[in-house]
Amino acid sequence: MVQLNVLLADSQQQASTNEASSMLNSMFNKENIDNFKIGLEQVMQLLEQTIATQQKPFSGILPQELAKKFIGIDLNQPLFDIQDALEEVAQLYLKDAVYFNNPRYLAHLNCPIVYQSILAELLATSINTAVETWDQSGGATFIEQSIVDWTLSKLALGEQADGVFTSGGTQSNLMAMLLARDFQCHLYAGHTNKQQGLPHDFRRLKIFTSKVSHFSIQKAAAILGLGYDAVVSVPYDEYFRMDMTALNQAIEHCQQQGDIVMAIVATAGTTDFGSIDPLTQIAEIAKRCGAWLHVDAAYGGGLLITPNNKHKLAGIECADSVTIDYHKSFFQPVSCSAFFVKDKQHLSVVTYHAEYLNPLSQQQAGTPDLCNKSIQTTRRFDALKLWFSLRTVGAQNLGVAFEQVMHLARQGYLLLASEADIEIIHQPQLSTLVFRFVGDSGAKDSELDAVNKYIRKQLSRQGEALIAATKVADKQYLKFTLLNCATTINDIQQVVRLIKQYGYQYLASDLANEHAPLSLALEEVSYG
């Protein structure tokens, strides 16, 4: 019996040894570089084939249809062979992916990317650099800091400014509200939230932002314990910018109630309209009432590098903090985003010294540990993508590309405005267009809501074009978001033709019979 147990143990040990040997053959290192190159060639073949044959931005598949493909996939049973795995990925992912580089992808703030940034992504992922501390990242630390400093020079926030890369605009806006909350609590009560938690009267803190600002401000308020009720939504003017009279009135009412103006969030490029709030005027109001001024330039930040449109961000230099998404108007892969603050001392709110990672002694010695200014610990080396793009493509060319899609938006506006059966409700400040199909029959708003929902879902189902949707004054609208330099006015004309085709098709049909089932079926599906 003892001998049998020994034999079993030896057998198990041998199996473990074989598995370990197999893992060694999969590790990225000099011994396996030839195998890695073979894998890269296989990936490139698949990419070339995919890009060459991709005609539409989307396959049109529904979630419940795609879900069926995953039935029977057993992740506990490896395929082992790279070619087999790539064929599976092609079927499960690439075949039904959404292609932002297609000229008729006009939906969300997703940009096609410069290929040089993909090369940088490959480098950063291959080395697997983590940038939270100097002893894990070396030169990567200084590349990120260089990108931060370069952006700060464009923002002109001053000598005490600093910043850090984040996962995206939502995290950057969360950091802004976190710093604003703690600054105000310390200012009015001498209270240190980091040590003591929130003061007893924290519900007096209020955040003022436009009704069309990004929803992440509400999310941040909830996460920070302030709640949605802490956010005061300020009406907008005819250009969908925060209305200054309404802002002043809202602040006055707040102060009369004994509340505290914690922060004012201005938007430089709203998601729907691309509208830019009057930053200089808002900065004056914020200064007068002692509020933290945050500028969400996740979308409009690309104006910083444009040859002819930098002036649209006048006043951003007055901000206490700024959000910029390079993965929008700088044509970088997701994610590539950063948060900036006028006074770097405020970043101490997110600093915690762990002896095993970033002890205080290292900071005192001048060691540049980036986790000292981030709410994240482990963090990817996203800055290399933009660094490499600046060194190979150049900031000016990236800026010209953004101006190109802005010009296209102006052309698109003129086209839509010339169509009698299309109602467009704003002129573009950046590269979005909000409009709706109205037909020629004087349909009610409720009917127009239904037809515009149908139009969007039909476009997606057929895969011919992808557009976005939004609501304005409780009415259903469609939206073009233009971020692709390859998109032409002809592409927009063709999409408008399809919009009108589906619109009239719906209006002419028996809504209760022929198209109601399809409409109801599609109603259950969200396309984002």
Where are these regions (language model features)?
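Short Gly/Ser/Thr- and Asp/Glu-enriched loop/turn motifs at secondary-structure junctions
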Residues: 159-160, 202, 426-431, 471-475
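Conserved PLP-binding catalytic core of the aspartate aminotransferase-like
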Residues: 423-459
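PLP-dependent enzyme catalytic core of the Aspartate aminotransferase-like
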Residues: 472-528
